[in-house]
Amino acid sequence: MTNRAGRPRPSRLFGKCGVSLNIFDIMGPVMVGPSSSHTAGAARIGRVARHLLGSQPAQAEILLHGSFASTGAGHGTDRAIVAGLLDMAPDDPNLPHSFRIAKDAGIEVSIRTVELRDAHPNTAVLHLTDRSGQTLSVSASSLGGGRIRVNSIDGMGAAFSGELPTVIIRNEDRPGIVSEVSRALSRRGANIATMQLYRDRRGGLAVMVMECDDPLPDGLREELAAIDGVVRCTCLELEGG
């Protein structure tokens, strides 16, 4: 089966309720095994968290919930998350050696289990600190097939996968910042596919998450970070998964 350009088109299967599944959703991603949920997804969680922090962490506390906690050791979930923190993709052949590589890099890693309320069974919470003392807390879940969902950043809600080029901004909650950010994206030709807004309280801290259709233009992060009231800006574009 081909598309209009004559290129092969992935076959699709239809399950109950008419849900359409791409054959690649069933086969899963290219990865170091054994599990797309417990290994590939876990590596992606660690990698997204590292990019949200903005640098390699010096300390990492990793909390594993549900099946991540009960079967994660056998599936290499802990090693996969640490590999992601080292910026390894799920198919990196060094993934099984991530503990040693992290130790050689001087990263302090602690791993323990936790029971979270109303959380997806494949959920991890990461508390990270870089060498400058900057901190980050991220909750994320592995949904299967190497796909993930970030649930919260520093305790504030979020819901994004990291599959699209994504801008994440932490800012003061006051009038005008959202419009300034939107104008900056428009000036540089970045089209927003989805936009989410969260805040801890009125007048407190807020999070903007904007998924974009195309690669993010050069210099965008610096322009957004310079907007008055923006506390931290991350432009998330992961190569290699």
Please provide the spans of the model-predicted regions.
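Generic N-terminal amphipathic, Lys/Arg-enriched alpha-helix
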Residues: L21-P34, C233
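A structural-propensity feature for long, helix-poor, extended segments
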Residues: E61, H65-D104
